[in-house]
Amino acid sequence: MDGCFSVLSVVTKPGDGVIIQNPVYPPFYASTKNCGCNIILNPLKCEDCNYMMDYDHLESLFNGTQPKPKVFILCSPHNATGRVWSKEELQRLFDILIKHDCFIISDEIHFDIVRSGFKHHTVGTFGKEVEQRMALLTAASKTFNLAGLRTSYVVIPNDEIRDAYKKFRTGRSGGNYFG
């Protein structure tokens, strides 16, 4: 989760709000807290054993919530529910986030592990408006069972944010010999 922490460190300041959709992979909480940010929960709704995003609740978080949400952490496909978001679901989500100028950190480490009949849609395929306010995090470790590799990569299309990220990472631990 070093990538998530590093991106949060670049795009937030202590006290900023970060939206997390629970239930979710617990290290998202630690990364957010370690940056001094406030966790704002947007719980997933479970209907007929199927988890869904609560768009109305998400929209309400931008109207009066203090601190105003600055970052949204997306887990796609979702860990812990296994939910693969449809293109339409993601587009609706991104429309809300763009409207409120909210940065997107998309953890897509399970992108290559989806059940038959489902298709993963990466955050980087939703156009320039999304692309300029996103960071995609992923790694080979899940797909190829290489957890010990402990190496991941981050895609940040926005030049200014990518430069700040590289500056933040300078002098910090790099990859191992195999990564």
Where are these regions (language model features)?
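A short helix-loop-beta submotif of the ANL/AMP-binding
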Residues: 34-39
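Phosphate-binding glycine-rich loop
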Residues: 1-17, 159
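Conserved PLP-anchoring active-site segment centered on the Schiff-base-forming lysine
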Residues: 10-32
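Short beta->alpha connector loops at strand-helix junctions that form conserved
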Residues: 22, 41-46
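Active-site phosphate-binding strand-loop segment of PLP-dependent enzymes
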Residues: 44-116
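PLP-dependent aminotransferase class I/II
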Residues: 133-179
